[in-house]
């Protein structure tokens, strides 16, 4: 039977509970243990696919096509695993499943209630997700005291009752510091633990989030009022990169605590590659300004995996990518913003809908004509095709039918399999697809392979009817879907580095295994800057 580490949060949201959960997993992975991770989101949405990026941040796409919470991205990057969509559990999924079972008659006439039917469904899914692993990390989203959390807290309380010492509770809470006196105030944390105990859960360990390291007096107070031994109180204070958090907690003894408390057999921890990555990340020899052009740039979390993929590539190249966020809506109003941005490379980001797209197209044009290394991702590739069709091929009204259904030159249009789709949720082209790479191209040089498997999330595609004309004008299609004829990668050989993809390369980037397209972008930017 696998062990469970359940991570809860208190005092306020946005503490980095997901990073702590991922760090716990990294600590156990460093000991050679097999680890998976589950994120519980108490909202009633079935998944994150239709949620506003400003509310939810990035939608992380799993290999099997799940549209999930961005914390699954943290888990995959820290644990170096690929997680299935079932590892993101929402209230919407739970209630939908219970109601469907009731309609089928699975409950044999019982009165269906939160306890036991909803809590049993939650436990069933947790045990299913944990199957075959030594340890499952379970993060419960939200803050203790939220109404939406109650069924999940009750379910993990029951899980502890049933499995005993195979379930360990870690509570993450904020301890502010009063700047006028320099005193750490532990009362909010004490109250959040008291609230957790009201639901029958006593934390086994506490992770204190704080701006700077807490003092011994604060540890004593937390131990006394939270009823947690001092050796089980850990401090995740602010650091310059989230990738230092596992090392920080390891130095405080969390690894030994987890192994002893859960009765695990693990080897001596090995952080060799991880420490090397963190060292390179923290002390690069040069900086590169990377323009990030998109429509949701006020909330960088909307592009979290792309940001992390650039950091991974930067660490490998001894370069720090300094991100310059470019609001495409503002570019529409004032294209002169682009020369003033002073970027060494340009990424045109994913997105949906008409707002701000002309500004994104202008970012493509600027990068193409000024010979700035360029990477377009998903929507960014589609808009790169639109820009090329307008300004090189001479089709002035070229567009995507997503943006202008009546365009006379639909160089991007709805994928055929999407024409009969009548629901938004979970209906896009999602998850892993095989991409064949054309020999002799930039893509082939970057990937050093003839085939790659990449994750997708889109409805629209390049219109094959226009591909011959685009190619005649100098655009090269360097990647095709293997199972259907679909453009996956485009590039411009006459440009120092201009490449764009229909797929999302960022979702498979790992700290010690950066993806080729991001390495290529930063390498080209470094080479350009030397000139």
UniProtKB/Swiss-Prot annotation:
UniProt EC number: 6.3.4.2
Binding, ATP: 14-19, 71
Biological or metabolic pathway of the protein: Pyrimidine metabolism; CTP biosynthesis via de novo pathway; CTP from UDP: step 2/2
Keyword terms, alphabetized: ATP-binding, Glutamine amidotransferase, Ligase, Magnesium, Metal-binding, Nucleotide-binding, Pyrimidine biosynthesis
Function description: Catalyzes the ATP-dependent amination of UTP to CTP with either L-glutamine or ammonia as the source of nitrogen. Regulates intracellular CTP levels through interactions with the four ribonucleotide triphosphates.
Quaternary context: Homotetramer.
Protein name: CTP synthase
Organism per entry: Pyrobaculum calidifontis (strain DSM 21063 / JCM 11548 / VA1)
Lineage: Archaea, Thermoproteota, Thermoprotei, Thermoproteales, Thermoproteaceae
